[in-house]
C-alpha cells in the first residue's frame, strides 16, 4: 500500500484559449520525505516538491523556521549549465523570486506557535520552454505540505492569469503573454462557504501594454485589476479541490507538534494593567526614533513591574508587550481614524524630490517620503553590457537591470553588508517590473540601463520609494520614458464591532503599520494605469468593495506623488556628457562580412581609427558607441561608406589617400572600399608636366591627393585625374565664358 501511486487532476478551462491540465501525483518519488508531490502542467512541465520537518522544535526561536528552496535543474530544459564547472550554482533570480511566491502564502497557513524547522524543496525537473514554472511550483509545494502530516490549513492554489484580448487566461504561455496587457500571479485558499480567500498577489503590466492600449486594448486600471482577482478565484478553487482529493487518498494524519505560544493570558492581563496608559501615550509620538526610544523605556518599566511576578518568563513579557502595542495601534485607527504618527488614514507624509543628487553619474535623483529616503542612480552603456541570463527561461538577456540595496544603517542598526539577501532581490524585482512597461524600446533607445536604488533611510515602503526615485533618475539620465511612474504602499486594518467587520485602509504605511495590519499592498503606476502590484493579506477574504475602495485610495495618493515628482523633473534631460553616445545604423545582411573584414581586420581598424565601440547584430543592425558623439558619427560614416555606399559618379571630386603604388600608377582610396587608379600619365600633371619614371618620387603611400573621377568602366573600375591647383578654377572660368 505504501508504494501505491495516487493521482488527482485539475482541468482549467480557458474557453477559446483551450484547456490546461494540472496533474498531481504522490507515492512514486521522494518517499522518505514527510510529504512529496509532483505537479505536471499538460504532462510537459514537471515540478517535484518535498516537505520535511525536524523531529524536535527549536524552542529558543521567536519566529517560525520555515525555509523554501527552489532548485532549477538545467536538464529540465535540455541545457548544460554555462558555468565553468558546468554545474548548477547559486539560485537564479527567477528561483529566488519563486521561493518568495511560495513562502508568502504558505507561512501564514501553518499553526501559530509552531517551532519545528520545516523545509520545502521544489525541484524543476522538466520544463516546456513556453511554460512558466513558478505557479506550478506553488501548487506542488502546497500539495507536498498538505500530505506531510503537519498542522497546515491548506491547500493553497496558485494561478497566473493574464489579460489577453479582453479575456483572463489561466496558466498562459510565454507566447500568449506577448499579447497580454496585464499579468498576475494569485494564490489563495478555498473557504467552506464556497468563496476563495486571496492570500497573495504579484502582478505587473507588460512591455507591450502601452502599445496594446494604444491599439484599442483595455488599460489595466484599478477596476480591471480587481476584476482579474475575481477571475482567478474559480481557477484557484479547482486547484484546491484537486489537492484536497489527493490529500484525502494519501495524506498522513496530522502529527502532534508542540506549539509555543508567545505568551499566556495572565502575562497580557498583568501587562495591560501595569503600562497600558504609558504605552498609549508613547504611541502618539510622531517621530520614529523618539517614539521607539519611549517605547523601549515603557518596555523596561513593564519588565521591572512584572519580572518578580513572572520569573523566567521574560520572553512572554516581551511578546505580550508587542501584542498590546498592536491592539492599541489598531484600536486607535478603527475608532479615531488616527495613526501612530498622528496622520489621518489617507494622509501622505511630507514628500521631497530632487534630481542631480550626486555628481559625475549619468543620472541621479533623491526621493523622500517622511523618514524613508531613496537615492536612485542610473548608468547607461552599450547593449553588449546587458545582463546575460543562463536560466531555464527562454529570455537570455536583460537590458534593464534594477538593483536594490538595503544597508543596515537605513534603520539605524548594525548588520551584515555584501551580497543581496532574498528580500533585496524581491524589492529590486518589484521596482523593475513597475518601470519596464514605460521604458523605450531597444530601437528607440539602444542602451543597456542599470538602475540602482539605495535605501538610505527606511520607515515604510522603500520599494515604492525606489520606483519614484528611479523614474526621476532615468529622466535625469535622458531616458525617454513613455510615462512617469510612482508607487505607494497601502495597509488595511479590520475589526469586528457589534458583529460587523469594519475595514480601514491606510495610505502610505509606516514600518510599524505594516507589521500590525491585516493586509499590505503596494501599487505602482502611471496616471493612466497600474504597472505593478504586490499584495499580502492575513484575512480570510476581503470584500470586493473594500479592495476596490483601497485601490482607488492608492490611485489618489499616486497621482499626488506624481505631481510632486513632476515639479522636480517632468521631461527627459539632456544626456550627461559622461554618458556614452550610442547610434545605430542598418546595413544589408550580406554586407556584414565586408564591415567585419577578413579576420575582423576592417571592424578593428574602424574602432582603432575612431575610438568607437561597435556591436553587430545578426539582422544587420549595428550599434556604435563612443564617449564623444563625433567619434560615433565618424564610425557611422565609415560603415556607411562600406555597406551603404553612395556610388561615385563621373566628375565628382574627392580628397583621396594613396593606398598602393605600382609601376603604372597609384591606387587612391576615395571612400572605404572604393579605390580608383591615378595612371602614371596623369601623375605627370602633379610633377609640373615632367616625365615620371617612379611613382614613389611624386606620390607615396598615405599621401593625400585631390582627384576627380574621369571614367567608370563597365566593371565599376574608376579612372582618376588629378585636380591641379588653379586648373579647376580656370576650367570653371572657361565654362562661364562659353
Curated annotation (Swiss-Prot):
Q: Which coenzymes or cofactors are required?
A: Mg(2+)
The record's section on Gene3D superfamilies has: GHMP Kinase, N-terminal domain, K Homology domain, type 1, Nucleic acid-binding proteins
Enzyme class at the top of the EC tree: transferase
Q: Where in the cell is it found?
A: Cytoplasm
Q: Which sites bind Mg(2+)?
A: 514, 520
What Gene Ontology biological process does one annotation of this record name? RNA processing
Q: Which residues form the KH domain?
A: 580-639
The alphabetized UniProt keywords are:
Cytoplasm, Magnesium, Metal-binding, Nucleotidyltransferase, RNA-binding, Transferase
E.C. numbers: 2.7.7.8
GO molecular function of the protein, one example? polyribonucleotide nucleotidyltransferase activity
Report the superkingdom from the record.
Answer: Bacteria
Q: State a single Pfam family of this protein.
A: KH_1
The S1 motif domain covers: 651-723
Its catalytic activity? RNA(n+1) + phosphate = RNA(n) + a ribonucleoside 5'-diphosphate
GO cellular component assignments: cytosol
The family classification in the record reads: Belongs to the polyribonucleotide nucleotidyltransferase family.
What the protein does comes down to: Involved in mRNA degradation. Catalyzes the phosphorolysis of single-stranded polyribonucleotides processively in the 3'- to 5'-direction.
Q: What is this protein called?
A: Polyribonucleotide nucleotidyltransferase
In the UniProt record, what gene is named as encoding this protein?
A: pnp
